[in-house]
């Protein structure tokens, strides 16, 4: 794919959910294609270690796209074909935190990223 601009920037916008169950995302930014970002999702209001957790995303003007899921104990992980081999989902149950390591980012990864239980 060719781009007319010298720089193509990628944006991972993050939104927190305000309710009894809280999932607060952080770590988005603007990067060049091919670079990396790590998103975090701090969970509270439920027993984090008992639930599988997902990342989903919504690109501008498009519907929700499932990205990845990790089992309650981190032993099983599954990915959408569009991110397989580039993104890695992980969790730290001692910190009630979910992560998404995003490598080799592409323009088409630009989206709002959400974590979900």
Swiss-Prot record:
Residues 116-117 are annotated as: Complementarity-determining-3. One of its GO terms (cellular component) is immunoglobulin complex. Residues 53-69 are annotated as: Framework-2. Its main location: secreted. Residues 78-115 are annotated as: Framework-3. Residues 20-117 form the Ig-like domain. It comes from the Eukaryota. Residues 45-52 are annotated as: Complementarity-determining-1. Residues 20-44 are annotated as: Framework-1. Residues 70-77 are annotated as: Complementarity-determining-2. It is found in: Secreted; Cell membrane. V region of the variable domain of immunoglobulin heavy chains that participates in the antigen recognition. Immunoglobulins, also known as antibodies, are membrane-bound or secreted glycoproteins produced by B lymphocytes. In the recognition phase of humoral immunity, the membrane-bound immunoglobulins serve as receptors which, upon binding of a specific antigen, trigger the clonal expansion and differentiation of B lymphocytes into immunoglobulins-secreting plasma cells. This is Immunoglobulin heavy variable 3-30. It comes from Homo sapiens (Human).
């Amino acid at each position: 794919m060719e781009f007319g601009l010298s720089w193509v920037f990628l944006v991972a916008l993050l939104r927190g959910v305000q309710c009894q169950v809280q999932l607060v995302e952080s770590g988005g930014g603007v990067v060049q294609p091919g670079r990396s970002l790590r998103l975090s999702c701090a969970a509270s209001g439920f027993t984090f270690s008992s639930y599988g957790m997902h990342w989903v995303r919504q690109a501008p003007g498009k519907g929700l796209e499932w990205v990845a899921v990790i089992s309650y104990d981190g032993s099983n992980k599954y990915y959408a074909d569009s991110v397989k081999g580039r993104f890695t989902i992980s969790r730290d149950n001692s910190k009630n935190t979910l992560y998404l390591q995003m490598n080799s980012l592409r323009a088409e990864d630009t989206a709002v990223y959400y974590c979900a239980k």
